[in-house]
């Protein structure tokens, strides 16, 4: 008391000396103190109002703001003095408040014992039930002659004193400087005084004071229930909840001296225990001290060791109760809490406590099923209902992180586990309950947190059960694996999910959209679906059991770290999922290399499958030692869609790898076989006998298509495996009109060094046809009978397949097709004005012939196009320059018998008989028809453009004879359905041979085709003055009814007329587009051979076929009236 201020000394002396102290003294003193504090509190606000500055929200924030703020410069008028005064007032205000709180604390420490024994006993709370007391009227007082030793304050053993304090009174009364603390004594003292309590029989154990340690987390204390009229004050820092069967603990006043040192042993305090319900059973002070000291030492030492380095930033574990002694907190953070006895919380207090606890995240472990008192004494272990206290949320900023850790299933920190072990030592005999009932029924948490805690505890229990099950399965290896049962670790990874859900991730190869997948692979197991139903966690091979057992070994080590391992496993699986999703995208784009499949095969070979696993999972390698990878079993963690796509990609990759090499090898073999055929004679090709034509046994080309093609469309190819020896038979077998060929050619032209045919001299013009069949344009529309019969079936719509060149044709187009049936018997008589045949190359590339035969293989009746208005003419007698046959695309089932003209010219040097007979046949036809061939100067360009696959043959032929180019252009014009009358009047005199009829629906042409035809038409119209006459649709239809009789010129003329009308339409349509290139082609027409220029035209393809209908409808009458009289007159003159 020597250090007290002067006013306080006077007050304390007067209060001690006077026998009866009235409450008004304390009221006056407190009123003055609060008035002073209120004045200092409002002083800054007044200064701010005068300075037009808004007041700060709270004293603490205002203090920090004002201390750090510097006076700003003047803004137009002098305000510096006012601000300085306000700053000074604000700085002095906290000091005044601190002094006020110090005075109050000292006053409370001085007046505490007197209030206990005197009139202010009600400030300390009601008497315990063990104390028998009566209330006396106001104004009664106690005698002041009692010894002062009895008035010493009582200190609870749990409230360990602060080392920096020197007086024991400050333990329970030292307030923090902040205004946020709560003073129970001050609040109760400011209220009207209540009747004091007097003891009729003063007991040596007066009511004890239990000062609560400030900021002590979760203190569990036991105290008697309060009286009915008592309402407990609210506590800010902690909410007191006590069990129902704890005894009240009271310390005798005479056992605790005033000079008690803060560091004295706790055993010096000898308390007395008073029973409930008025029972005054005494417990020996020594036994109580020993029990209290033992429990408190264990508790305090364990907590100090773990939390000594953490003061305000203590991390509260979600599953632990961490108590922090008073000595670990700074004096500034110690709230001023008056020493009040323990009490039972009313329902209102419980509701208030629950509201405080909802903001926190308390979790209790089974180690804290028994509550603890403030003094450190453990309550009986039979009390299973735990009521915990949680610190405010502001003291634990780490709680959201801990909550996330709980939700994510992360392992607890090591410090938390250590603390849990320490507390489990203090309560070793706890009852074992179910994991789902760990938390008490009345645990003050929100329903959401309750569910999360129950789920977390349930997961821990299931994981422990799964570990036990794993150990049991390890003792009996091979039983569950042999039967295909799920493995134990599935329950730990799936966390409660059934094995059926994991087994739904399957990939069945038999459900692949490709129906021939099983035929392609051939080695796919038949019962893959049964294997898919097996456990997806199995690894291939018998050694998979050992590897899986090795993977499960770490899981059996420690149950406390299973959550961490599970988290790591999930992380690995997530990485694998991301990797597989990235690879899946590459797989869909076709970027997976061949090494991926090799890695799969290496994995399968590394794990040999036993007989037992073959029965269950059907993963045994097939006979060809190519294991069928089950993606659902190896990659069970992937999504079903990802597994299905990946499996389909693997199957396609295998099929491609299996069939890619045979297809690459097969093509050279076919070319080699076709090379042998190129040396065969062309006698039968030029003019086969009726017997040969009728017997089509070996004429058809056998097309081999791979059975069980893989799903990839690129692998579906048709290959010619057995080409027949007789090319004409093979090309004409499917056509019944081949029987009309009964005449054999007679002439044989001479051959030069290069094996090409030489043109005969003027005397040999009789057996040389100047051009393959050139149709007369003077025939009537009623004279075409046989051709109509042949093309009558062209009404059946059939797709015209673009075909490559036919074998033995050196420069033949890929789409060359011959409609040669009725024209074979036509022979032109040996005229003196027959043009030379183009020089043909003998050499033939076998690789080119491969594509030719493939084209011929599809020349069957089922693939003819719809062409009712166009007759069909055989192309076997048409001679082509440089091996190009102006074959018209097939329009009916006669297309299979089309023979390209190149066969007749590309003969070997030693086989001249075929060409001789062919020349005789052509000359006879020319004599019967009496027409002259038109010439075509675009032969050379078209030959080069239309046959890019075979450039070397026709290039060297073009340099020798310019007539060859003209012959080619003439045959090119045969494909087009139009022909100008000017061309026919002048050029038909040269060569009127067999021309091929085009169809309206023709296969697509090459880009150079149209350009060559345009050039040809421009040259024709530049030299001619006549306009083309249109061909009526009637004339085209009547041509079908034309019958060709070998040797009759009348039928030949009629046939030529029909063909000429079609050619006129093409030429008239293309004339407008080729007017710019007329001068360039005139020179080619100026070089006649034997007095007759040679004109040939390339086939006219689909892009020009669309123009036929328009030309036929617009120029019917004009072309018909102009062309026929002139042509008939020319034919009669010859």
Curated annotation (Swiss-Prot):
The chain crosses the membrane at residues 23-43. Keywords: Differentiation, Membrane, Spermatogenesis, Transmembrane, Transmembrane helix. Disulfide bonds: none annotated. Residues 132-148, 954-970, 1125-1134 have a biased composition (Basic and acidic residues). Residues 204-235 have a biased composition (Pro residues). One of its GO terms (biological process) is spermatogenesis. InterPro entries: SPATA31 (IPR039509), SPATA31F3-like (IPR027970). May play a role in spermatogenesis. This is Spermatogenesis-associated protein 31C2.
